[in-house]
């Protein structure tokens, strides 16, 4: 699933705004804008409109997130969102009908309306016929092909932080089910609680599986003291399988974190002497709580995306490389330094190459690799493509002028600094000034103010 286009009418600041995405050419969409231009509002409503897909995937009668009444533009009685997504070829196409105006059967569209009645109460209406047909295609394909995964839909608002690391809960119902990868509810902020619960669960499961392999090899040995033979058998056992197989979820998590944070060498759950989350970061082994708030938040965000992809692609050896879907991150440059800000989008694309990544931000460092992005400028309730070629030409022209001016400027050797006057000379000058009478002192002050230092020297 890829987002093809979305249109807003009379929603908050957006009276008539449409975005046409180009995932095939530019898989990353960057929406830049100053503060209070509506970036968060835009991304929030994109997510709200897309939640109807996982909601109907869960149950044909389940609604997605409904537009709040207060988001209807002032002095307007109705607002509308129209969404269009691209259906992957492996899922087929929508059936053609004589009444439909859509010619491309690989696209699925649905509309969401909110109308205020005479009492000022909003009434929601939806047109989801094509969405329901698409969900039927997904159910048919996934039943026939268990290896086929489901698309990701993840949204991370600007208010995101690690509040509590809950590692004590075990055996939570439904935590490893695919449907738990979707959040079909309004999300004003996120604390990544589900990621830490999932991390404890898969660590227990995959550590137990690894221990079972070792125990099976030990049981085959007649002499339990032959440690070298046990180690050799263990190496042979693991050599016959892909390296992801013993712990596919943990492998996906660690390898993805390594791509986005090269300075993070390891990330694991320590059971003894006490249960805690550990990180090997910049050559030091630290408790997770000892990392900076920004580092903790980004590790949790990336880990949560990995969690969702692992749940939606349970039989994939590389869920992060094979998983598809839409990833939405608001204010991606928040709390990042300049170095990470310029590289974060490129690294996210390397870690999740088949995800459609849509982000908002305000800093120019995000444009470091903008040649491969789809960039928009949001201002005054309208969105327009960012002309990167013109900006690049202007920068190159300025750079050329600076180089030419530097070549024409004659080289001037810096003058040597005057040696610091000796202390005895200063004391002698001070003593001479003290020996002057009041009239001479006043004359000296007048000449100093007038800048006539030559006369001052001769009089002394």
Predicted ranges, named:
Residues 35-36, 74, 145, 242, ...:
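Aromatic-acidic/polar surface patches that form glycan- and anion
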Residues 1-61, 266, 271-406:
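Switch/communication elements of ASCE P-loop NTPase nucleotide-binding domains
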Residues 1-214, 371, 375, 380, ...:
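P-loop NTPase switch/coupling surface
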Residues 149, 246-254, 395, 405:
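A structural signal for well-ordered alpha-helical scaffolds and beta->alpha junctions
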Residues 24, 184-322, 413, 426-427, ...:
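Extended helical coiled-coil dimerization/tether regions that scaffold
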Residues 68-72, 222-224, 228, 350-351, ...:
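An exposure/low-complexity boundary signal
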